[in-house]
Amino acid sequence: MECRERRLAADLIALSSVEGLPVSEAAKRLCMTRQGLYKLLKQLRAEGYVAEGSVVKLTPKGRDFLSGILRDLLRYFNIASIRLVGRVVSGLGEGAFYISLEGYKRAIEERLGFTPFPGTLNIKLDPQYMPYRRYLDGLPGVVIPGFSNGLRTYGAVKAFRARVNGVEGAVVMPERTHHPTDVIEVVAPVKLRDALGLRDGDVVEVEVLL
């Protein structure tokens, strides 16, 4: 990594810790003067790493840069799992429909080793865990192939074995989804809301096995 890239990495890591904060508050948290932070933000905005606005926010380019660093670090340290934390949110009920389809159900049984409860647990991730979520996009995972029932074609799903508060399951990432990127879906052999006594807003921890 060149000197400029090392400096950029340090700056973006620091800024990621204060995303969403006004510049004045972010400067205090980072032990910087407002003038110093404004100067840094101006430079990084010009390079496309930080978004315009009154609060600190990385652009997709900035997040992709950090995701690349994370990927290299996890590979170097041979990390076997990552931890995601978020809050339970309600979905639209689509998970129950899709998981109950024979094509998906059978493939999950064959490739993940369990019969899925017909439904998914939706978790909205805390912002600081988004670099880890984006890291999963670049991994192969376990592919649940798409299929057609003669009337409609259903897309492939990438999955990662996982534990939700200790309960075995899998994070599923459909190639077609209505969820924003900060919401993940988890399938399991049991109804996770009941098994773990979860309600909307409850904090959950997901250990994703790589």
Swiss-Prot record:
Keywords: Flavoprotein, FMN, Kinase, Magnesium, Metal-binding, Nucleotide-binding, Transferase. CDP binds at G91, L92, G93, E94, G95, A96, V190, K191, L192, R193. The lineage of its organism: Archaea, Thermoproteota, Thermoprotei, Thermoproteales, Thermoproteaceae. This is Riboflavin kinase. Gene3D superfamilies: Riboflavin kinase-like, Winged helix-like DNA-binding domain superfamily/Winged helix DNA-binding domain. It comes from Pyrobaculum arsenaticum (strain DSM 13514 / JCM 11321 / PZ6). GO terms for molecular function: magnesium ion binding; nucleotide binding; riboflavin kinase activity. InterPro entries: RibK_CTP-dep (IPR039063), Riboflavin_kinase_archaeal (IPR023470), Riboflavin_kinase_CTP-dep (IPR023602), Riboflavin_kinase_dom_sf (IPR023465), WH-like_DNA-bd_sf (IPR036388), WH_DNA-bd_sf (IPR036390). FMN binds at T177, E185. Binds 1 Mg(2+) ion per subunit. The keyword Nucleotide-binding applies.
